[in-house]
Curated annotation (Swiss-Prot):
Membrane protein topology class: Multi-pass membrane protein
InterPro entries: DUF5378
Lineage, broadest ranks: Bacteria, Bacillati, Mycoplasmatota, Mycoplasmoidales, Mycoplasmoidaceae
One annotated Gene Ontology cellular component of this protein: plasma membrane
Pfam family of the protein (one): DUF5378
Protein name: Uncharacterized protein MG135
Location(s) in or outside the cell: Cell membrane
Amino acid sequence: MQTLNYLVIILIIAGVISVLAFTPLVRKLKIRFYLIQVLAIVLFVYVFFGRQIIYLFPDVYGQNSQSSQNLDSLRLSRIFLLDLCPFFAVIAPVFVFLKQKKISGVLAVFGLFGALVTLFGELIFTPVNEQDIVNFIFVGTGNNQIYFMMHFLSLLVSLAIILWDNCFSLISFFYIHVFALIYFSYVALMVSVFKGQITGNTTGILASDWTNGEYKNVATFLNLSNSDPQLVFIVGFSLSYVAILLMTLFANIPTFMEMKKDKIFIKKENLIRKDLELLA
């Protein structure tokens, strides 16, 4: 790992600490929902105009000059949001503005997990030199437009939603399964519709995903053979499932605390009622 990679790690940790540090203050403010919405707008605008629009209007941005199967596959993945992190960055900000907060909470769990895996499973290990550090952080390189900043902002927005908003309850455990079923079914359907045209960037649906990028590094970390993508797929998805459940459990801690307070309150009420009955 190079010296500049540690700078990237410091930036990530500083962002996380900032969200955590402001959490007690923000939760006391009536405008906390607006603060989340501002962060969500920044994420959406950055990703849409810095990344999505290039694939929606490739002729305007000169992206059709060198057409290839890999590039065509990437376009389809980008346009239809078949990768979880771009999906979160574009779709989650929309749900932040809805009165029903449960959906944004569920998306935040997946967004947080995806951002952490990519940031710490791939990006902090990407070789960076002094000439490219600014582009790496703010612009991206090659076809990985704003790759770091998209995941960094997704990390901050996800944390803000989870910590600042009261959008979780016990039913969230049910909702994360519903979302996973719908989203992965959607990705599998699009892969089937564009059979042979989409070769990767499908949130792990295709085996090629598990031999590249953060998946490859995670497989190396878990000491799994990249020559056996099925094993990487099974272990990776299993660990991902457990991690998402634990994140949902963590997000529900305030709910559990409220339930405990309610039980104590009800118990006190019952004791008072019994005392009054004895006095009567």
